[in-house]
Amino acid sequence: MADYLLYESATGYSLFDVVGADQIAAKTKEVQLSLQDISKFGKVVQLRSFIPFKNAAHALENANDISEGVLNDFLKNFLELNLPKASKKKKVSLGVQDKNLATSIKSEIDAIECDTSELTQDLLRGIRFHGDKLLKQLSPGDFERAQLGLGHSYSRAKVKFNVNRNDNMIIQAIAILDQLDKDINTFAMRMKEWYSWHFPELSKIVGDNYKYAVIVTLVGDKTTINDEMLHDLAAVVDDDKDIAQSIINAGKVSMGQDISEIDLENILSFAERVIKLSNYRKQLHNYLVQKMNVVAPNLAELIGEMVGARLISHAGSLTNLSKCPASTVQILGAEKALFRALKTRGNTPKYGIIYHSSFIGKAGAKNKGRISRFLANKCSIASRIDNFSDAPTTAFGQVLRRQVEERLNFFDTGVAPTRNSIAMAEAYEKALSSVNIDGDEEVDIDVEETVETISEKPSKKEKKDKKEKKKEKSKKKRSADDASEEVKKSKKKKKSH
C-alpha cells in the first residue's frame, strides 16, 4: 500500500498523504464506498504539497511528458523536495496512476518505490473526483478552465503533428472523385437524351461526354451551324477535321425537331455544368496525384496513385494499411466475397482492390493469383516505408516496381529475377543519395558493408554441400568406430585363447 499519492492535473502536480494505510488496505470495499463522500474521503487522504504550472505552454509540455511516460526535471525536483528521505530498511512508497511513468520514476530515483495497484487507482480516482475541493488554493472555475484549455492545446498538437503528410485528405479526395465520376456520367447521359431531341446525330459522331458537352455549348441551335465553325469544332475533337466536317454535315440535314429559346438556354446551362464538373474532376485528380507523391510516394510509384489511394481509403489510414499483413492487403475490397466463400466453404478470392493494377491485367490467367500475392507483399513493404520514414523518397518504390515487372517476366519467359537482397541494397543506396542528411561528415554509412551482410546468407547449393559434408563425416566416424570395436573384440578373443 502506497504512503503517498501523486496526482497530475491540468493545473499542476499534487502530492497527498495516505492516512491509515493499513486500515485502508484491510477495508477496500469501505474505501470504494467513501469515494463519493468528500467528508469521509477527506479523512483518508490529505494534501501534502501542490505546485502549479507556470503557463499553458508549460502545462502542455508536462502533459506530453506524462503521456509518453517521461520523468522531466520539473516533476523530479518536486518529488525530491516534498517526499521524505528513505531509510536503508524501507523505501518511500508512492502511488502513481501511469505504469510507464512509474517505471521511469523508479529508474531515476532509487529511494522511491512506485505502486500502481488497484487500491491506489481507487484512491487516485477519488482525488480526481474531488480535485477542486481538495485543492483549496484554486478559486472556483480555475480547475475547469485549465482542463478545457489543456485539452484543446493537447488535441491540437496531436492533430497537427504533420500537416503535409495528412492521409485524411487522400481519403476524402478519392471519395469525391468516385462520386464525381458517377455524377458526370449521370448528367452527361441526361444531357445527351435532352439535346438528342434537337440534334440526335451528334451523340453517334462524338462519344466522349466532355467533348459532347463542349460541342453542345459551341453549336447551340443546329440551324445556325455553318462551315465557319470547322476550325472551332476541330479544336474540340483533337484537330480532326473529318469529324468536324461530319458534325457540320449532320447538322444541316438533321432529323431532330426544332427547339425553343427557353429550352435551349436550359440545355446549354446544363452542358456548362457538366463541363465545370469535368474540369474540377481533372483538377482534383492532379491534386490527388501530388498528395500521394507526398504522403505515400513509394506506394504511388509501385501500384499507381489511384489504386494506392483506394487502398489507403479502404484501410482507414496509411498507418492502418502499414499494419496489415500482405494477405490482408491482397483481399482488401473483397470482404463480401471472402465471407461468402468462408460461409459456403468455397474458394476464397485472390484479389480485391489491387485487381485494378496494371500488373494483374498483364499476367496470364494461371499467374494472376501468384502475381497478386507478390504485389500485395510489395505493397505492404512500400506502405510501411512510407508510414515510418521521416524523409519521403521514391527510391524503394521504383525498385519494388521493377521487382514486380521482373516477376511477371519470370512467369512468361522463365528468366530468373534479381535477388531481393541485391534489389533492397540498391534501393537503400538510392534513398541515401536522394535524402540530404544533416552533418554528412559525422554520418558514415557504408552501403557495401550492408550488401555484404545481406548477401552473407548461404544459398541453397551451399546448404546442400554442407549437409552432404556432414553426412560423409558422420559415415567416416561410424566406420572408424566399427573398426575400433572389431579390433577390441579380436584382442579379447586372443586373450581368452
Curated annotation (Swiss-Prot):
Function: Required for 60S ribosomal subunit synthesis.
InterPro entries: Nop56/Nop58 (IPR045056), NOP58/56_N (IPR012974), Nop_C (IPR042239), Nop_dom (IPR002687), Nop_dom_sf (IPR036070), NOSIC (IPR012976)
Pfam families linked: Nop, NOP5NT
Nop domain: residues covered: 295-413
Protein name: Nucleolar protein 56
Subunit (UniProt): Component of the ribosomal small subunit (SSU) processome.
Compositional bias annotation for Basic and acidic residues: 479-488
One GO MF term: snoRNA binding
Organism of origin: Schizosaccharomyces pombe (strain 972 / ATCC 24843) (Fission yeast)
Predominant subcellular localization, coarse grouping: nucleus
One GO CC annotation: small nuclear ribonucleoprotein complex
This protein's record includes keyword Repeat: no
Keywords, ordered alphabetically: Nucleus, Ribonucleoprotein, Ribosome biogenesis
GO biological process, alphabetically ordered: snoRNA guided rRNA 2'-O-methylation
Keyword DNA-binding: no
